[in-house]
Amino acid sequence: MSVQPHHHQLGDWPLACGHTIADARISYLQIGDANPDGSNLILVPSSYGAQVEDLAWLANAVFDPGRWCIVIAGQFGNGASSSPSHGAMGLAEQGWVVRHRDNVAAQKRLLQERFGAERLAMVYGWSMGAQQAYQWAVDEPGWTERICCVCGTARTSPHNRLFLLSLRQALTADRHWNGSGFNAPPEQGLRTYALIYASWAASQPFFRQIDEAVEEHVERHWLPHYQRHDPRDLIAMLDTWLAHDVAGGGDLQAALGRIRARTAVVAGSHDLYFPPDDLRADADAIPGATFHVIHSELGHRAGNPHSSPIEQGHLRRITAELLAHPNSS
């Protein structure tokens, strides 16, 4: 069993935007052993800003690694897979926009070449990971037995776009932005970015119960997470999120209606990014999908409860129910 992150080389990788990543690579982490027929593979695409090791808490807390082989895959732009910080790609200003269809294709290549896989027991994702799970079900129905989409939607909503654009503007308004990158670390831009991010990621009840000033809380607990990233990578992932639409600009209801995977859609009661009504609408469009709400003051982070046993228990129950039933398609 591998417990360290690895990279899988993809060669020159064409993107839907028309550019090609030279010598592309995808980061991944394997927890648990694959069955000889690959029937126990669970793919976990990464969320915004996450390294694959950040999601390793799912083993044992949600999935039994003695039964399931959990493959956590890093999306392009996360700093470990091919990213602007490597010089591998540019930003939207130069016409570079990675779409989740590109991420799904790279993950499929990883699974084929590293694991000999032809099918996945489940694609499980939170936030941008949920977006990729939806994309898997739309693009690769023959591969995707089940999807569990936690705190994420099948298309970026207009209101969610405003949040993302405010984050992008916080970074590119910094005095060190030069139109294609940064001449120096955008310290003020990152501080503004962290304040905006925190105000949306956690809920109003969450901030009412903290025992320090909110600006100090953000400085201590939020800002360091974003400072570990090259800001160009943060922007690249924002652009992927902004471009997200499993229907590619077409009929979303029709695209979701064609999903054959057994599906669970999981909302957070206080999620300000992806409110329950938005997730319920996606679930209602997918044949046979189940809809769940985790009642939690963690806000959007209720779907990534790495240190919150109550929320972990909800996710463990939902995924166990999903995995207990074969896909009838």
Where are these regions (language model features)?
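Conserved alpha/beta-hydrolase "acid-adjacent" motif
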Residues: L272-D278
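N-terminal cap/lid subdomain of alpha/beta-hydrolase-fold enzymes
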Residues: S27-G87
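Conserved hydrolase catalytic core segment
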Residues: E118-R161
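Alpha/beta-hydrolase-fold enzymes
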Residues: W143-P224
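Catalytic-loop region of hydrolases
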Residues: M1-V44, S329
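Short beta-strand/loop motif that positions the catalytic acidic residue
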Residues: I259, V265-A267
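Catalytic active-site module of serine/aspartate enzymes centered on a nucleophile-bearing elbow/loop
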Residues: R280-A281, G288-S329
